Design a protein with these regions (language model features):
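Outer-membrane beta-barrel proteins and related beta-barrel translocases across Gram-negative bacteria
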Residues: 1-41, 45-56, 60-424
């Protein structure tokens, strides 16, 4: 039978790791249990930070939710919240209701208590609303909103503390991530776009209130808008980029705008393949010189196969050309060739159950003259190769040896094991 009672019980829920003690457990059915005069926690037994103590807790594993009557939430044994009725999730299924509160303490802010509420708006939208009380600062409100539509999706996070009692100023943070596709009658493929925006009321916000919205821990917060289109063998994109500087790092250049384009011939073995990349950027800075950079890189390669495609030799050459024009009136140019020669072998051994592959490879990279434009507009250079970016080209003469091996299942092609080793 699936029903019955157990007195003076200690229980553990295997699927969630939740555990507790109960004066009596009433097993109503296979998936529905009632716990009388009971406790509930998901903390590790060695460190029980919080605990829910209730007159009765009912757990419905079929629905994925639990409910408590006359419940007290304790943190480190100290009662911090009483509620006559409380619901909480048992698994990942979505349902509107209160989530477990959090409690903390800092020397500056004092006691810190949050009580989040989850709102399951619709199958493709949800929100979490979190009132927060910080003893010496006041009351704040945070919100998270997520949405998923057929042609776009995104997430919005925001937090506001009106008139911080310690500083007398409004404190806030805001973060938006949105991306989607735009269908147009004139274009074969949709335009894709993405917006990333994050800002703070002040540079001390993250240290005062914590990084609870998942903002980057780097010294800058990203503020970008991108639109991209590709069709067959060509692609074009446009970018507007700014930053909010959090730490002591130097202010990066804004890109207002950056335009990229690329085209490549139809790639095939045993024939000459062509490609070209180009970029225009207007760099903007509040204190340094503004500038424009024009960059283009044509490339050509030939993938010569032999031994029934078990081996190949691939020579390639490219020419990176950059031109800089500064608002001070000065200009400079840089032109750097890049030569590569790559060769490899492909071995495979098949058994009744597996396919084992082995791919040794050798690659020679050569940039004849070390050059530098004298400019450094990119804190993190979006390198066009592993050896040089658009602002510099160090002299390079490198031979790289590598070997890769895979073990695949014959039944469905699943990669069971992959290893590689490389030495320059």
């Amino acid at each position: 039978t699936d029903s019955g009672t157990i007195d003076n019980a200690h229980y553990t829920i295997a699927t969630t790791g939740a555990r507790g003690d109960a004066k009596q457990i009433e097993m109503v059915s296979r998936y529905l249990n009632r716990y009388h005069n009971t406790t509930y926690t998901t903390c590790d037994p060695a460190e029980k930070s919080w605990e829910l103590q209730a007159e009765q807790i009912e757990m419905d594993e079929l629905e994925g939710w639990g409910s408590a009557k006359n419940a007290v939430v304790r943190f480190k044994g100290v009662p911090i919240l009483y509620t006559p009725s409380y619901t909480f999730p048992l698994d990942e299924r979505r349902k509107s209701g209160m989530l477990f509160p959090t409690w903390g303490y800092s020397e500056v802010g004092g006691g810190d208590f949050s009580a989040p509420y989850y709102w399951n708006i619709s199958p493709n939208q949800d929100a979490t609303i979190t009132p927060r009380s910080i003893g010496r600062r006041g009351l704040s409100l945070s919100g998270n909103f997520r949405y998923l539509n057929s042609d776009n999706h995104g997430e919005i996070d925001a937090s506001l503390l009106p008139s911080d009692d310690l500083t007398g100023k409004d404190r806030y943070q805001f973060k938006l991530n949105h991306q989607g596709d735009l269908e147009t009658a004139q274009l074969v493929n949709p335009l894709s776009y993405q917006i990333n925006y994050a800002t703070l009321s002040d540079k001390q916000y993250l240290s005062d209130f914590g990084n609870n919205l998942g903002l980057s821990s780097s010294d800058t917060l990203e503020q970008t808008a991108t639109i991209h289109y590709n069709q067959d063998r060509w692609a074009v994109s446009a970018l507007l980029s700014d930053h909010y500087t959090v730490g002591t790092a130097a202010e990066p250049y804004r890109r207002l705008p950056q335009i990229d384009g690329s085209w490549s011939s139809e790639s095939a073995n045993n024939q000459l393949n062509y490609s070209v990349e180009g970029q225009f950027v207007h760099f903007d800075h509040s204190s340094n010189s503004n500038a424009e950079r024009y960059w283009i890189k044509p490339s050509a390669s030939y993938n010569y196969t032999l031994l029934n495609d078990a081996a190949y030799i691939k020579p390639a050459v490219s020419l990176s050309q950059s031109h800089y024009s500064l608002d001070s009136g000065s200009s400079s140019s840089m032109s750097v060739p890049h030569y590569t020669l790559e060769s490899g072998l492909f071995f495979d051994r098949e058994t009744t159950t597996h396919l084992h592959t082995l791919e040794p490879k050798i690659k020679f990279n050569y940039i004849p003259d070390g050059k530098n434009s004298g400019h450094d507009f990119e804190t993190n250079s979006d390198d066009s190769s592993e050896f040089y970016g658009k602002d510099s080209a160090p002299h390079t003469k490198v031979v790289t040896l590598s070997v890769a091996s895979d073990l695949l299942s014959n039944s469905d092609g699943t990669k069971l094991l992959s290893t590689s080793l490389e030495r320059s």
